[in-house]
């Protein structure tokens, strides 16, 4: 299977080869890895549980384990910062199973080459058929070969947020007792009877 969406560049693929076994041994899955250079070099790792719901403590554990392996392998020549995070609500879609898991939700998909005169597609995911990602666009449902994709991510919508909150609550990962109470009283400039 093509994993260019998980690790695009050659150095990213090398990082994935090194860190995937570590992450999988811990019970997690690699969603994406990127080595980004600029003023500073950052190795960004996105991981998740197979059923979703990675926590901050999980990210810290992954960071420690991956850091130890990278110290031994030493694949990055420059100093770098290691960032481990969840994929987030508007997560990248990097594996065929992601397109099945989020069927019905809105996504943006880009292809490496032109398909029917365009490279960008936005619409509701309609599942997977063999090695094709199905997406409902204005013109109808189309199939894009997974290997054609250069980028794909969920679009942040109210429905997606509600579903993620529902899943976290169902998994017991959302404790509403720690939320602040929100006051919905409206202040007005009209003086009350006692102010006159």
UniProtKB/Swiss-Prot annotation:
Similarity comment: family membership: Belongs to the RimP family.
Family annotation (CDD domains): YlxS_C
Question: Looking at the keywords, is Cytoplasm present?
Answer: yes
| Major subcellular site | cytoplasm
Q: Which InterPro entries match?
A: Ribosome_maturation_RimP, RimP_C, RimP_C_sf, RimP_N, RimP_N_sf
Task: Show the taxonomic lineage.
Answer: Bacteria, Pseudomonadati, Pseudomonadota, Alphaproteobacteria, Rhodobacterales
- List all Acidic residues biased stretches: 177-196
Q: What does this protein do?
A: Required for maturation of 30S ribosomal subunits.
Q: Where is this region: Disordered?
A: 176-196
Query: By its UniProt entry, which HAMAP family does this protein fall under?
Result: RimP
Any Gene Ontology biological process = translation
Encoding gene (name): rimP
Q: What is this protein called?
A: Ribosome maturation factor RimP
Sorted alphabetically, which Pfam families does this protein's record hold?
DUF150_C (PF17384), RimP_N (PF02576)
Source organism: Roseobacter denitrificans (strain ATCC 33942 / OCh 114) (Erythrobacter sp. (strain OCh 114))
Write out the GO cellular component annotations. Answer: cytosol
| Sorted UniProt keywords | Cytoplasm, Ribosome biogenesis
């Amino acid at each position: 299977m093509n994993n260019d969406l998980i690790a695009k560049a050659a150095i990213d693929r090398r990082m994935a080869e090194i860190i995937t076994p570590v992450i999988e041994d811990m019970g997690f899955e690699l969603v994406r890895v990127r080595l980004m250079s600029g003023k500073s070099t950052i190795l960004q790792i996105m991981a998740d549980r197979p059923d979703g719901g990675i926590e901050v403590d999980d990210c810290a554990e992954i960071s420690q384990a991956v850091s130890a392996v990278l110290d031994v392998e030493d694949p990055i020549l420059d100093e770098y910062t290691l960032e481990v995070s969840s994929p987030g609500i508007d997560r990248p879609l990097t594996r065929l199973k992601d397109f099945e898991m989020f069927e019905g939700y809105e996504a943006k998909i880009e292809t490496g080459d032109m398909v029917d005169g365009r490279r960008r597609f936005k619409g509701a995911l309609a599942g997977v058929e063999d090695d094709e990602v199905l997406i409902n666009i204005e013109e109808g449902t189309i199939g894009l070969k997974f290997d054609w994709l250069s980028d794909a991510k969920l679009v942040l919508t109210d429905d997606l947020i509600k579903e993620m909150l529902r899943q976290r609550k169902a998994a017991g990962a959302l404790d509403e007792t720690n939320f602040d109470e929100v006051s919905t009283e409206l202040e007005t400039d009209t003086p009350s009877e006692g102010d006159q």
